[in-house]
């Protein structure tokens, strides 16, 4: 999986996905909630 955030040298996720606390992309509250690093509300 593509790494994002701190673990991925500041990379953002494709398709407006949230960057979770462990540096992986996803769209569930696990990624978008507590610990989210970027695009936590999509690409607005």
Curated annotation (Swiss-Prot):
Top-rank lineage group of the source organism: Eukaryota
Disulfide bond among keywords: yes
Gene3D superfamilies given in the database record: Endochitinase-like (3.30.60.10)
Any one Gene Ontology BP term: killing of cells of another organism
InterPro entries, sorted: Chitin-bd_1, Endochitinase-like_sf
SUPFAM superfamilies, sorted: Plant lectins/antimicrobial peptides
Record keywords, A-Z: Antimicrobial, Chitin-binding, Disulfide bond, Fungicide, Plant defense
PROSITE patterns in the record: CHIT_BIND_I_2
GO MF term (any one): chitin binding
Residue intervals of the Chitin-binding type-1 domain: 1-42
Post-translational modification: Contains 5 disulfide bonds.
Disulphide bonds in the chain: 4-19, 13-25, 16-43, 18-32, 36-40
Protein name: Antimicrobial peptide 1b
